[in-house]
Amino acid sequence: MEGVSALLARCPTAGLAGGLGVTACAAAGVLLYRIARRMKPTHTVVNCWFCNQDTVVPYGNRNCWDCPHCEQYNGFQENGDYNKPIPAQYLEHLNHVVSGSPGPRAPAQPLQWVSSQVLLCRRCSHHQTAKVKQLAAFSPRDEGRYDEEIEVYRHHLEQMYKLCRPCQAAVEHYIKHQNRQLRALLLSHQFKRREADQTHTQSFCASAVKAPAQVIVLRALAFLACAFLLTTALYGTSNPFAPGAPLPPTLPTGSNGSAPPDNGTATGAEGWRQLLGLLPEHAAEKLREAWAFGQSHQMGVVALGLLTCLLAMLLAGRIRLRRIDAFSTGLWALLLGLHLAEQYLQAASPSWLDTLKFSTTSLCCLVGFTAAVATRKATGPRRFRPRRSEKQQ
């Protein structure tokens, strides 16, 4: 340790460059670690194009899977066609009727779809069949105006094969009945989706508030580094772990610069000496060496504090980013700049630089303590806002 201290004392610029290099390498290593952890998921959630139901499938089958709800194949090309041949499209014996049992929350009366033969009379049903056949056999005079010609032809068939009054009334009543049932299903679907969004938002907020353990440890380490700098500024060149070490000097109150004896100060000094006497000799020696090393390399301690703040912000992520973390990092950067200016000026440094450095260290210590203690409040996502329907928009 003494050899490293002597080397850094001879080459302060090299020591600073080495500290900055270690900081950059550590930050790059953490960034590469986070990028490497972003692996593709094994499963993903897909939505059926036919029944609009969500299903969890393997990640490799996200564009080729069968829906377990409606048993339809979901796999499409860029032009909208299927990405594989479907024999059931042209072989009738491969198709079967799909039926499902209603869920516990399903309405007591499910949707009932009736055919035109049940809803219409024999004459109107025959007319509708003839109209469909004639529309299927329609051939336009000009292929470029196919849409216009078939619309005119459809209107002509509607006028020719009008429904009788009883059938027209039955059709209108049936349409109103289906509209009511579909509206109830739509409202129920929107309500369930809103409940799912609220549950997801609440769980996401709960996970966003809790900071990881490594982030809390890094914030505490930054506070301890700043507390060490503040303590060294208060003690000056003295070592508090040395035998017979005094307490931090107090401001003089007399006109001649000498402070009157204080019983509280004397009692505190005696208690500190007794506490040091309880420590083993080798432990006290290690503490003295660590104090001397940190006191002679305060710029390295400042670089360590700045590195811990940056790593804490990087590991916390954008969701848990707080203003106090950014403010603490700015104070650490300012403190590093003041130490660099003091080392550059050396003997010609002005007196106000020490005052500014002590004030910045005190403020950084206070902000670091607040950032280390207040670990439950995060910016997180905003308050949940329910989606508006198309009519409200």
From Swiss-Prot:
Keywords: Acetylation, Angiogenesis, Cytoplasm, Cytoskeleton, Glycoprotein, Membrane, Nucleus, Transmembrane, Transmembrane helix. Glycans are attached at residues 256, 263. It holds the Pfam family DUF2448. It comes from the Eukaryota. This is Transmembrane protein 201. GO terms for molecular function: actin filament binding; lamin binding. Its main location: nucleus. The chain crosses the membrane at residues 215-235, 299-319, 324-344, 358-375.
